[in-house]
Structure formats: C-alpha cells, structure tokens
Amino acid sequence: MLKKQMVLLISLLLLAFSSTAAAANWQWVASDENVGVFFDTESLRFGKIDKLGIDKNIVYVWWYMALDDAFSQKQPYNGEIVKKIVRYDKLNLNEQTITGLEVILRDTDGFILGQKNNTGTEHIAPDSRAALMYSAVKEYARIHAEEITERSIK
C-alpha cells in the first residue's frame, strides 16, 4: 500500500513540474485588478542588419495580457469573452515605439476569437500596459544581450 502511495505521489510531482516547465519562459511584468502582463523571454530577437549584423535597438517579442473575468466580460469581442490578448510586436528602443505585427484574441478555452496583422506603429504611452512591457523587455534585453544576440543570428 505504501509503495502505491509513493508511486502516486511521485507521479503527481512529475506532472506538476512538467506542467509548469512549459510556462517557465513567460516572465511576469505587472498586474492590476483587471489585467496581468507577461512576455516570452525565449521569443526575444534583435533586429537584423544585412546578413551578419544585428540591431540591439530593435527587439521582437511575444507578450500577452491576461484579463480578469469581470473585466473581460465588460469588453466582449463579437459577443465572446476575451480572456487573453496575445501580441507579437517590434519595439524600437531608441524611438520608444511599438509596431504591432500580430494581435490574437483568445477565449477562456484558448480558442482564437480574432486575429489581426500589421496593426501599425505608435509611440508607447507613459503609464500604459505597453510601457510596462516595454520597460521590462528593455531591461531583460540589456541583461541578456549575449543570449538574445546568439538567438537572433540563427
């Protein structure tokens, strides 16, 4: 009996670790009562210059905003509840601009409700969620520049 309990305990621990390992590259940026902001550290790439060079002032990143239940119900999309807004953006660290390359709206089950490409370039507004993400990505890119450079060259 004790052997079965130990096997069950070990199985549960392995399951718990394997389910969190996939999310390990999503770094928390900030949260308020309505939205949590995260970015994918593994997705960071610097912009390319020619074939061999990179521009460390241009950073590509996947990030998302997870919406609270009450907040998401106030802002439906085509009658559906949006739980997550996932974005792929190009950040210009010199000009403090963000270029939306892809925006994906997901429901509570993770299904895509809507998708839009090339949403344009805009300046990052102070005190916005994009500004929080921008600052976190900029700092992460500064600290991990060598790792991101290697990933960007591949």
Question: Where do the PLM segments sit?
Answer:
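Bacterial N-terminal signal peptides that target proteins for export
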Residues: 1-8
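Bacterial N-terminal signal peptides
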Residues: 9-16
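N-terminal secretory-pathway/extracellular module detecting exported/lumenal segments
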Residues: 20-87, 92-154
